[in-house]
Regions:
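Acetyl-CoA-dependent GNAT
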Residues: 3-69, 80-86, 90, 138-141
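Residue-level recognition of the GNAT/N-acetyltransferase active site
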Residues: 67, 71, 100-102, 127
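Conserved acetyl-CoA-binding loop-helix of GNAT-fold acetyltransferases
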Residues: 72-86, 104-113
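Conserved GNAT acetyl-CoA-binding A-motif
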Residues: 87-98, 121
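Conserved catalytic-core motifs of GNAT/GCN5-like acyltransferases
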Residues: 98, 116-132
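Conserved acetyl-CoA-binding loop of GNAT-fold acetyltransferases
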Residues: 111-120, 141
């Protein structure tokens, strides 16, 4: 991700989430040494992105989104796979994420990619209020 991508990512946030990140919050990730963000582009347009933070070899996927016009075309899957490979190169040993319990397409994708449910966070999401499923994938370097 570069600073040029930030406005498009912020717009994508508003298309995909009930509680979107602000442009300022996204831009601050560029300065965070713990963060890794990847984008999928088509021409000059950001059609998807994924962001993570890693501390002491444990990574947390903070956000992943694909433009509604580009869903079900493998963009999200490619982003998560690319993130995993980049994290392995940084010697991370696992990737954890939260997903809305009602987000069946995302849960199905994560399970396909080898993530397993390891817990729940009660009332984690707002607008509407909903539990988060915690999923994790571990690997050996």
């Amino acid at each position: 991700m570069t600073s040029e991508h930030v406005p498009q990512i912020a717009h994508l946030e508003t298309l995909c989430f009930h509680d979107p990140w602000s442009e300022k919050s996204i831009a601050s990730e560029l300065e965070n040494a713990l963060s890794l963000w990847l984008v999928a582009v088509e021409g000059d347009d950001v059609i998807g992105y994924v962001g993570s933070q890693t501390v002491l070899g444990w990574s947390d996927m903070m956000n992943v989104a694909v433009h509604p016009d580009h869903r079900r075309k493998g963009v999200g899957e490619s982003l998560v796979i690319a993130l995993e490979e980049a994290l392995k190169a940084q010697e991370s040993t696992c990737l954890t994420l939260e997903v809305r319990g009602s987000n069946d397409p995302a849960r199905t994708l994560y399970e396909k990619l080898g993530f397993a449910e390891v817990g729940r966070r009660k009332n984690y999401y707002r607008n509407p209020k909903e539990d988060a499923l915690i999923m994790r994938k571990e690997w050996v370097l």
